[in-house]
């Protein structure tokens, strides 16, 4: 069974082909970072415009490069939410129109379920239940996964998501959007003992997150200098990243204790951060647990995860329960369960 996946939840246009027997055949992403960087963030109207421009050529390209005929596709999976309304509409309309033309089924996929299950593309599917942590530009959530389609959000972010916090602090340091990845690069040259950022919401019980205070702390710290040299930027970046890592580790310990889970899946754009990965590996090793990451190339938004989840749902033949066009606020908890 061959599934075409379409991803247009925000500003990345993605297309992929997944084979139930062979696995991921091909996936490609067209980024809009160079377009939005001049505005300091994603401009929804421009995202929609460039999705419309890019989607058809991208799909044509993956079929050409995979030597697979469009007629061989058995179904089309597309991101239906959460995300930007205009962006979602472009992908959903394209996918549904193509499916109608080919007379094959289309299925709406939850973007966060795609992220959550991305590690399964690389690894053998872990046994349920397991604990998942999604850390991206728009979401920071602990998810208890009891089955495919049966999820409970047990920890959430009360304000800025983790990836958003990285980008905002990077901007304060003069790094162009999206600056989170570049912040991590300069943090490697930073002195870990020069500055200290608070570890938000770690002195209180619970596994919710809050990162807006770190942005304020960084803003005040930057403002205390009349002029910041390059080393100071590196030192601030290091202190910020250390705070993030410590906070995530503390929260993961609590979440693992609460759920009694020995399995932790980490996904989303921020999960590509290597210092964070190292600390999470040490954490799970100390607990004799199992840790699963997404491949770094699949941490950010992509269609491979959408095609993969689509293949699971088509295999279960449970498409009617998810027959929505788009839902910009679609929660993981609102996904219908698929019976084994």
Curated annotation (Swiss-Prot):
CDD domains: ASKHA_NBD_TsaD_bac. GO terms for cellular component: cytoplasm. Substrate binds at residues 134-138, 167, 180, 273. It is found in: Cytoplasm. Keywords: Acyltransferase, Cytoplasm, Iron, Metal-binding, Transferase, tRNA processing. Binds 1 Fe(2+) ion per subunit. Fe cation binds at residues 111, 115, 301. Its EC number is 2.3.1.234. One of its GO terms (molecular function) is N(6)-L-threonylcarbamoyladenine synthase activity. It holds the Pfam family TsaD. Its cofactor is Fe(2+). Belongs to the KAE1 / TsaD family. This is tRNA N6-adenosine threonylcarbamoyltransferase. It comes from Wigglesworthia glossinidia brevipalpis. The gene is tsaD.
């Amino acid at each position: 069974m061959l599934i075409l996946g379409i991803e247009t939840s925000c500003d990345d246009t993605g297309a992929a082909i997944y084979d139930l027997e062979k696995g991921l055949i091909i996936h490609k992403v067209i980024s809009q970072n160079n377009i939005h960087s001049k505005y300091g963030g994603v401009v929804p109207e421009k995202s929609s415009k460039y999705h419309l421009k890019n989607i058809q050529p991208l799909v044509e390209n993956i079929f050409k490069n995979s030597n697979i005929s469009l007629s061989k596709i058995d179904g089309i999976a597309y991101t239906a939410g959460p995300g930007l309304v205009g962006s979602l509409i472009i992908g959903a309309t394209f996918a549904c129109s193509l499916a109608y033309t080919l007379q094959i089924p289309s299925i709406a996929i939850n973007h966060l379920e795609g992220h959550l299950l991305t590690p399964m593309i690389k690894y053998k599917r872990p046994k349920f239940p397991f604990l998942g942590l999604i850390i991206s530009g728009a979401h920071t959530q602990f998810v208890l996964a009891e089955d495919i389609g049966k999820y409970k959000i047990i920890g959430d972010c009360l304000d800025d998501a983790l990836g958003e916090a990285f980008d905002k602090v990077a901007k304060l340091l003069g790094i162009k959007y999206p600056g989170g990845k570049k912040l991590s690069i300069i943090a490697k040259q930073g002195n870990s003992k020069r500055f200290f950022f608070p570890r938000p919401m770690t002195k209180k019980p619970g596994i919710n997150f809050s990162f807006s205070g770190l942005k304020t702390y960084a803003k005040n710290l930057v403002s205390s200098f009349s002029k910041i040299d390059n080393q100071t930027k590196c030192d601030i970046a290091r202190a910020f990243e250390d705070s993030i890592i410590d906070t995530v580790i503390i929260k993961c310990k609590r979440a693992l204790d609460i759920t009694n889970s020995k399995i932790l899946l980490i996904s989303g754009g921020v999960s590509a951060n290597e210092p964070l990965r190292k600390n999470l590996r040490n954490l799970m090793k100390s607990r004799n647990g199992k840790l699963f990451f997404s491949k770094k190339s699949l941490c950010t938004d992509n269609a491979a995860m959408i095609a993969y989840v689509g293949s699971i749902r088509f295999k279960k033949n449970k498409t009617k329960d998810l027959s929505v066009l788009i839902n910009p606020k679609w929660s993981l908890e609102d996904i219908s369960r698929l019976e084994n």
